[in-house]
Amino acid sequence: MAEDAQGRPAPTSPFFVTIPSKLLPQLPDIPSDRPVLIAGPTASGKSALAVRLVEDGGGVVVNADALQVYDCWRILSARPSAAEEAALPHRLYGHVGARQTYSAGHWLKEVAAVLAEGLRPVIVGGTGLYFSALTEGLAEIPHTPPEVRAEADARLAEAGLARMVAELDAETAARIDLQNPARVQRAWEVLRATGRGLARWQAETAPPLLPLSDATALVIRPDPTWLAQRIDSRFNLMMADGALEEVRAALPGWDPTLPSARAIGAPELVAHLRGEIPLDEAVAAAKLASRQYAKRQRTWFRNRMRLWHEIRLP
């Protein structure tokens, strides 16, 4: 089995670089010097499209996926292979340690440094918050104290998501994804630490780093049934490429409260490796989690990216 630079299994399946056949004909005219943003749900072919655009027009592929930043996840996050990263300029992939915290603010500062390099950026990913921070601006919210983070972790574990949602201010609750535990906990922490709701802080947002009017913004809108089939097929290939071994390598010191532990499929495979569920159940649960994640992504894109150029698939 192939390995990456850190000795971990590296994805080899051609599925990871497949562009759906009906995608390219839907592209608008894209000047070679204009920044490109590509958003889409998991397994929709967006990363392969970014590579094609850089191959054809030059520039650098920039990651906008909150899990592809972590060095422990190449296969499970569908990060580009080591060979792909070497073939073209790539930025912000696999550069963060598994135990480090990494926020949209961290990402935005690093993107600013990439833009300063002067290469045309093709920014691609499925984390909607990164794109909104980039094109709409990001509020300067004070850092959450460790004791508040610990209190939030305990409260979510003991009282559950619904209770935490009920304790949010109404303005924030109306704006965030209430099905996303990470987003809800972050909003709860801000309110607890500062006495002001997240929505109030966001109202004091600085100007955007890259306004939408200065970029070609593409959002992939796949048919849910078609996408579900691709998700299931891709996870099968991930397993064949060594996803279980990748999770096994991350098992020592596993901490489910870390942001890196939110990799889709990781908790399910950890449960199997700990003897809690059989492998077939873990795989089925991981596929379900991936489909549910894709649904949340589609909802975000539909509600927040109405001015982006749509690409319908298949």
Swiss-Prot record:
Gene3D superfamilies with a match to the protein in the record: 1.10.20.140, P-loop containing nucleotide triphosphate hydrolases (3.40.50.300)
Pfam families on file: IPPT
Binding site for ATP: G40, P41, T42, A43, S44, G45, K46, S47
Positions with a binding annotation for substrate: T42, A43, S44, G45, K46, S47
GO biological process, one term: tRNA modification
UniProt GO molecular function: ATP binding; tRNA dimethylallyltransferase activity
Cofactor(s) the record lists: Mg(2+)
Keywords: ATP-binding, Magnesium, Nucleotide-binding, Transferase, tRNA processing
Catalytic EC class: transferase
Keyword Nucleotide-binding: yes
Interaction with substrate tRNA (site feature) positions: T127, R149
Assembly information from the UniProt record: Monomer.
Function: Catalyzes the transfer of a dimethylallyl group onto the adenine at position 37 in tRNAs that read codons beginning with uridine, leading to the formation of N6-(dimethylallyl)adenosine (i(6)A).
PANTHER family associated with the record: TRNA DIMETHYLALLYLTRANSFERASE
Family: Belongs to the IPP transferase family.
Listed name of the protein: tRNA dimethylallyltransferase
Naturally occurring in which organism (per UniProt): Cereibacter sphaeroides (strain KD131 / KCTC 12085) (Rhodobacter sphaeroides)
